[in-house]
């Protein structure tokens, strides 16, 4: 799963919502990286100090998934992804944010 983000406008969309094998923020061009503070809408998350990761709010991911998040299968997959992220140290201390790497290539943001 990945979030397509235009850092100039803040527009963002969740893609491949049922692929729980990867998580990333995909921006249009390499010129957009590293991300500057303030380029990610606060409703989506926050830019990590390195500008190459974004902590995306888990509740926002659920909201962006829309009706897919209502299914037991989606929730189980998301919970498993969160558990893996937790074991890997990729959650904020309060568990509200999931660390996503930033890339320009959607193929690196999926299990493909």
Give the residues covered by each predicted segment.
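Generic signature of intrinsically disordered, low-complexity segments enriched in small/polar residues
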Residues: 5, 23-26, 58-60, 81, ...
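Short, compact, well-ordered microdomains
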Residues: 64-112
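Short glycine-rich, basic-tinged beta-strand/loop micro-motifs
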Residues: 48-68
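Generic detector of well-ordered alpha-helical segments enriched in charged/polar residues
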Residues: 34-41, 45, 58, 62, ...
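Residue-identity detector for threonine
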Residues: 9, 21, 29, 39, ...
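Short helix/strand-capping turn motifs
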Residues: 2-54
